[in-house]
Amino acid sequence: MSSQSSILVDFRPLATSFTGKYGSIQYCVRAVLERPQVPDQSVRRELQVVSHVDVNTPPLLTPMLKTQEKMVGCWLFTSGPVSLSVKIERKGYCNGEAIPIYAEIENCSSRLVVPKAAIFQTQTYLASGKTKTVRHMVANVRGNHIGSGSTDTWNGKMLKIPPVTPSILDCCIIRVYIHIPGAKKLMLELPLVIGTIPYSGFGRRNSSMASQFSMDMCWLALALPEQPEAPPNYADVVSEEEFSRHIPPYPQPSACDGEACYSMFACIQEFRFQPPPLYSESHAQLFCLQPVGPTNRAHF
């Protein structure tokens, strides 16, 4: 015998399922079959809950930047300062993404230093008024040695995020530090959120598409015909002497109706060798051809 039933789940924000060294976050469904005079029977099934973290929200798109300087040595035995400036493009990333790190390191001390960057995951357990914190490294990258009086620049040095649990209350950080032999490390920490909804780059893609569209439309301006220029004046091109020299003799017609024929011939002679009219956009006229005779019109 089998039956189906449903329950109403409260979809308020829930923390992502997690299992750690000193505690865990688990969700389960437990069903109990109660019968009179018979022991109850129960079954339990675990539910995997993932609280989605969208890295496209404005707080997680904010760039992170920090700068710090440390004097190497103490008292009268100082050897000079070491400065570090670090920036990442945004605060939120997802599993599998590579974080480009931009850093400037200046070594004004007399010692050899080595810059490093790492991702640390921090787990904090609270129970019975006591707190237990566990921090472990999940990824790291190392730079080149920097000698005394030298500088080094990271122009997007990649630090790839391995498969880790999505952040619960911003529990991850990026730690960039400089190992200085014989002295304490110069360390910077930038907050990092591991999300579940990857970065879409919507705004940047729109701007690139708009620039590409404007570039693609450049050919249209080249293909459009230029504004036509007015033709030159006929008198400037053909002189009066050349004009009279090229007029062929026209004999008088033998058979003509008299005045009508003469007037028509005079009209032809009058306009045959006249220069074309000057072109002017302000006096341009549109000519329409109209049908002669009755037309049929349909009404709908």
Curated annotation (Swiss-Prot):
| Assigned keywords, A-Z | Cell membrane, Cytoplasmic vesicle, Endosome, Membrane, Repeat
Any one GO CC term of this protein is: endosome
Q: Which Gene3D superfamilies match?
A: 2.60.40.640
Q: Where is this motif: PPxY motif 2?
A: 276-279
Principal place of residence: other
Instruction: Output the GO biological process annotations, alphabetical, semicolon-separated.
Output: extracellular vesicle biogenesis; positive regulation of interferon-beta production; protein K63-linked ubiquitination; protein transport; protein ubiquitination
| Cross-referenced Pfam families | Arrestin_C, Arrestin_N
Instruction: Motif PPxY motif 1: list the residue ranges.
Output: 231-234
Task: Please provide, alphabetically and separated by semicolons, the GO molecular function terms listed in this UniProt record.
Answer: ubiquitin-like ligase-substrate adaptor activity
Per UniProt, what is the membrane topology? Peripheral membrane protein
Do you know which InterPro entries this protein is assigned to?
A: Arrestin-like_C, Arrestin-like_N, Arrestin_C-like, Arrestin_domain-protein, Ig_E-set
Report the locations given in the UniProt record.
Answer: Early endosome; Cell membrane; Cytoplasmic vesicle
Alphabetical list of SUPFAM superfamilies matching this protein = E set domains
Q: What does this protein do?
A: Functions as an adapter recruiting ubiquitin-protein ligases to their specific substrates. Plays a role in endocytosis of activated G protein-coupled receptors (GPCRs) Through an ubiquitination-dependent mechanism also plays a role in the incorporation of SLC11A2 into extracellular vesicles. May play a role in glucose uptake. Participates in innate immune response by promoting IFIH1/MDA5 activation through interaction with TRIM65.
On assembly, the entry states: Interacts with ADRB2. Interacts (via PPxY motifs) with ITCH, NEDD4L and WWP2. Interacts with AVPR2. Identified in a complex containing at least ARRDC4, AVPR2 and HGS. Interacts with SLC11A2; controls the incorporation of SLC11A2 into extracellular vesicles through an ubiquitination-dependent mechanism. Interacts with TRIM65.
Question: Which family would the database say this protein is a member of?
Answer: Belongs to the arrestin family.
State what protein this is by name: Arrestin domain-containing protein 4
Organism of derivation: Rattus norvegicus
What gene is this protein a product of?
Arrdc4
